[in-house]
């Protein structure tokens, strides 16, 4: 059968929060079957636990923030994208601050950390959410849609009236049965415009942002000396965000997500709409791994 997955070993990292600019210590620990991904604010007494779930998202300004009784865990989407890409179901994520570390602005460092910890299969079937019918949410000219698909596919399009974007592909579609998340999506960094940064900082946002953890664009060009990691890195990062946001459903998906200019708020609205329409999805397991339309890399054997 396709089994649930957790980590083999504890893994630690240190970084800064993209929006708070605060130093943050992160520890990721293995967790039992059916735990899900649980964030723990260990800087608080008593410690507050917030499970990654669609209905736990309380703020969606520039990131997905989990909120419970006024306690926050911000910018969870890049880490959750790495967890989704590696098919990890269960983990405890301990944090010393109200925001995940931004690392280099992509999911790449998280993928590396998780692979270094090693992935362990558990004694229970992995649960998938299979999309059974089309569901769409809209806001102005933005849309987010789920459609049935025998596998996991993400199609995303963006529209920026800007010289840097006009010369690059603003549409990408990836079927994850044939394309590696780790190779094609994980390294895409978040991006921002110089013109927005002063305003964001006046709102106490993007305080930790720099060319070390984001692609920064002025009126005409990309300011990062090394340029882009993928020619379509902008739209690939929006896919990365969406994959992380969708993992807040709590299980891996069997279906296609189609986003047009969608962001964290609309992605979350789609999850809530799917959960509201109980006939739009079903939870499935696979006794025979060869029957599954989705596959994951074999667990990486970490040093014992």
Curated annotation (Swiss-Prot):
Keywords: Hydrolase, Lipid A biosynthesis, Lipid biosynthesis, Lipid metabolism, Metal-binding, Zinc. Zn(2+) binds at residues 78, 237, 241. It catalyses: a UDP-3-O-[(3R)-3-hydroxyacyl]-N-acetyl-alpha-D-glucosamine + H2O = a UDP-3-O-[(3R)-3-hydroxyacyl]-alpha-D-glucosamine + acetate. Its EC number is 3.5.1.108. GO terms for cellular component: membrane. Disulfide bonds: none annotated. It holds the Pfam family LpxC. The active site is at 264 (proton donor). Its cofactor is Zn(2+). GO terms for biological process: lipid A biosynthetic process. One of its GO terms (molecular function) is metal ion binding. Pathway: Glycolipid biosynthesis; lipid IV(A) biosynthesis; lipid IV(A) from (3R)-3-hydroxytetradecanoyl-[acyl-carrier-protein] and UDP-N-acetyl-alpha-D-glucosamine: step 2/6. The keyword rRNA-binding does not apply. It comes from the Bacteria. Catalyzes the hydrolysis of UDP-3-O-myristoyl-N-acetylglucosamine to form UDP-3-O-myristoylglucosamine and acetate, the committed step in lipid A biosynthesis. Belongs to the LpxC family. This is UDP-3-O-acyl-N-acetylglucosamine deacetylase. The gene is lpxC.
